[in-house]
Amino acid sequence: MISVMSSAASFRTEKDLLGVLEVPAQAYYGIQTLRAVNNFRLSGVPISHYPKLVVGLAMVKQAAADANRELGQLSERKHAAISEACARLIRGDFHEEFVVDMIQGGAGTSTNMNANEVIANIALEAMGHQKGEYQYLHPNNDVNMAQSTNDAYPTAIRLGLLLGHDALLASLDSLIQAFAAKGAEFSHVLKMGRTQLQDAVPMTLGQEFRAFATTLGEDLARLKTLAPELLTEVNLGGTAIGTGINADPRYQALAVQRLATISGQPLVPAADLIEATSDMGAFVLFSGMLKRTAVKLSKICNDLRLLSSGPRTGINEINLPARQPGSSIMPGKVNPVIPEAVNQVAFQVIGNDLALTMAAEGGQLQLNVMEPLIAFKIFDSIRLLQRAMDMLREHCIVGITANEARCRELVEHSIGLVTALNPYIGYENATRIARIALESGRGVLELVREEGLLDDAMLDDILRPENMIAPRLVPLKA
């Protein structure tokens, strides 16, 4: 590739095997990136949308340069310039130069070349040259030395996921703590549990919210161990298909060791580079775990919407914080917009997992060319989940209040209360009371009192929350 500045100085002319193109003079990307931008106008989501992926790419290029310098393949001056460029990308500079669409043909070559060209042009300026003067430092020959897209790109994806993993875990943990706090706050609020949307047996609102915390806690524990298990084995050094062609035999170990040091992640070389280059199983499993979390979040949000329904004609056991007016035609209406939004995020994550699964299955022979879609969907799922969990916690969970009187009223009027009374009044009496209550619309307690089956003191003892919400063996009445 050769660059020539145009007379207007607003563009520079770069050349590749397909011909010449005018690249914006101020752009740090080059001709191959520009071709990709022109070819792939698809999702509208550029690589820069995911900063951890950009940082992962820069770290891979830094590690490769370090290894090549140690092996005597890269000059000290070029190594210093590439190192400065990578350091700036890792700090967050120049991310706007990563302009290629996340969805692209070529198995990620456009992303890799976007990184190579940006690093090369930053390095050229550090050396005192102009952008595009690749005769002094070349995107392919120098920045991409001993690499293929097929090992640099998947390694950067794995590293980007690892670098962002703690933030995802922190958001999930904070949400769990918020649910647990509400569980403690509502521990005294007796309410009816429901199965199949029908009254079942009493429980506390605190138990309901603690269960939300527990189920998400299971996912937190799995995610903490899953990412290190799945993503720390990298195929850097395998080059095109895993054979390591065009790389020094010592390069793989050096490059991976340097990458582990640079990133602070416990990266190790893949045991089978052919398998590691062609198989996408780690991404499938990790995405499946994200989907599981999304499914749980959506179910929880369904419950929150049901429990707050009404407020006058629904369940109305809890109040969700009012976030915005709910209708352009119905005055005073307020909708559960935060749980609704989380539901939609969950649907997107579930869809992302399906798309990723199909892309993983779509690989052929020694390479999966669908890896750009895999990267896009998994980074998108993480971004959406993290934002949704933060939103749910900040704008909904911490502000939930209980309608204690309503909860108690529903318990006292529920036919399901006869299950708790059954050991004291006997099955025949309990069945008869339930039938009369259903037919007449009267309350169970009212009928029990009327027939003198239990006195008020006994009823008060039976209806104490601690006696209704945990195992308690009572000899059945004969």
Swiss-Prot record:
Residues recorded as binding L-aspartate, renumbered to this chain, are 109, 148-150, 195, 328, 333
* Stored Gene3D superfamilies: Fumarase/aspartase (C-terminal domain), Fumarase/aspartase (Central domain), Fumarase/aspartase (N-terminal domain)
* Keywords per UniProt: Lyase
Task: Fetch the InterPro entries from UniProt.
Answer: ApsA (IPR004708), Aspartate_Ammonia-Lyase (IPR051546), Fumarase/histidase_N (IPR024083), Fumarase_C_C (IPR018951), Fumarate_lyase_CS (IPR020557), Fumarate_lyase_fam (IPR000362), Fumarate_lyase_N (IPR022761), L-Aspartase-like (IPR008948)
User: Which NCBIfam families does its entry note?
Assistant: aspA, PRK12273.1
Q: What does this protein do?
A: Catalyzes the reversible conversion of L-aspartate to fumarate and ammonia.
Q: How does it assemble?
A: Homotetramer.
Name it.
Answer: Aspartate ammonia-lyase
**What is the taxonomic lineage of the source species?**
Bacteria, Pseudomonadati, Pseudomonadota, Gammaproteobacteria, Pseudomonadales
| Gene assigned in the entry | aspA
